[in-house]
Structures are given as structure tokens and as C-alpha cells.
């Protein structure tokens, strides 16, 4: 897969008059950009320097994500490293909030209860890492019509609020990203 360079996108958006952008680290992983290599620090600092020159602010970022509740998920160690790297890069860019998806325990007969427990376990070290970088984690509402009759955890506002409320008793850098398109799809 070929993906435009982030630097080209920053320049084109600046020329078009944009001043605020989102940084999508999920695509940076999917399309195997320098983000996934040992050259990631040089790459992100080059983007930071260009964004400053072009007067572009990155207001938020989307972290790499995967279904961490799936015991058979491939490349977990690599993907976990990319989640943390997303936070590191966001911090370098001055991003205050990184958006990430919750996972779903599709194998559980008690999907909501078990998914919540696994999400809490997963997000604790992620939130600690993010706090050390002065970054917040915003868990995003999901949609699941494409996998019906199965369902995903955090497709409802109630599940998402419950998860974030539970995590916020221990962490002050967790919040919600409400994706209106996802919510509209679920109407």
C-alpha cells in the first residue's frame, strides 16, 4: 500500500489554509511509514519542525489500536509498542489528547462485563505511560453494524461512560472521544 508522506499532507493542508490537523498513527502503522521503524524519532521531529514552520497545530491524534481482548491477536507485542509510540509521538507534536479504541471480548458469554475488565487491565499501563508524557487518552465510541449480529463493547454511550468513569477514579488523564459518525451509524 502506498500512502502520501505526512510532510506532503501538512504542506498541502497549510497551503489550503488549514491550521489545525489530526495525526493518525493507525494509518502510519498500517501503511508502514517510518513511524514503525527505528527512524521514528527523526521522522516525528521532521514533522514537528515542518508543522511549526507552516503554523500547523496537531490538536489530537489517533493511536494505533487493535482488539487487545482477543487472545489470538497477531503481533501483540509490536502493536502494543506502536500504541505507546503513538503516545510518544503525540507528546513530541504537543498533542494533548490521543484517541484510542476499546477492545471487545467476543468469546465471552458476558461480553460487557469481561470486556470492561480486560479494558481496565489494558488501559492502566497505557494511561500511566500517557501521563508521563503529559498526554490524555480519549476512548472513542465504536460501531458494530458491520459485524451484526455480533456487537462491540463501547458502542453505547452507557458502556463508554461506565468504562471511562471507572478508569477516572484512578487516572485524571482519561476521557471520551465522541465520534458523531459512529453514533449516527448506530441510530
Region spans (language model):
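Acidic/histidine-rich catalytic cores of soluble enzymes
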Residues: 21, 114, 124-187
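Active-site-proximal loop/turn and secondary-structure-junction residues that shape catalytic pockets
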Residues: 25-27, 64-67, 102-106, 141-145, ...
